From Swiss-Prot:
UniProt keyword Ribonucleoprotein, yes or no: yes
PANTHER family registered for this protein in UniProt: 39S RIBOSOMAL PROTEIN L12, LARGE RIBOSOMAL SUBUNIT PROTEIN BL12M
Organism, scientific name: Porphyra purpurea (Red seaweed)
GO biological process: translation
Location of this chain's protein in the cell: Plastid, Chloroplast
Protein name, per record: Large ribosomal subunit protein bL12c
Length: 129
């Protein structure tokens, strides 16, 4: 692997969840692509190439579930959901109003806890499973 690619990879590893979401959004806009379509193929390829690694991942992957949003806190939670997921206003509003709803699947423990803290600070009830 070239030095340039290694440097980019190291920079990507240092991004937090919000920065990664922003990066994905910018890549989608710049290159006119849809990251959600590409992630399906990557997810299917990973288990076949490293079945031993998937056992380890299962123990470290968590789902962040938006359990409940009190009416007075809906706008604050909506803003946090938009920043965490990169969703548009309507999509984020629909998600918040349809709680309980899974926001993120397969998140690392640190990312899941960070998301939970931000959502709880905004007034939502959040579960990490």
């Amino acid at each position: 692997m070239s030095t340039k690619v290694e440097n980019i990879l190291e920079e990507l590893k240092s991004l937090n969840l919000l920065e990664a979401a922003e990066l994905v959004k910018q890549i989608e806009e710049t290159f006119d692509v849809d990251a959600s379509a590409a992630s399906g193929g990557v997810m299917m390829a990973a288990p076949s190439s490293a079945p031993a690694a998937s056992d380890v991942e299962e123990k470290t992957e968590f789902d962040v579930v938006l359990e409940e949003v009190p009416a007075p806190k809906k706008i604050a939670v909506l803003k946090v959901v938009r920043s965490l997921t990169g969703l548009g206003l309507k999509e984020a509003k629909d998600l918040v109003e349809s709680a309980p709803k899974t926001l993120k699947e397969g998140a690392s423990k640190d990312d899941a806890e960070a998301m939970k803290k931000q959502l709880e600070d905004a007034g939502a009830t959040v579960g990490v499973k």
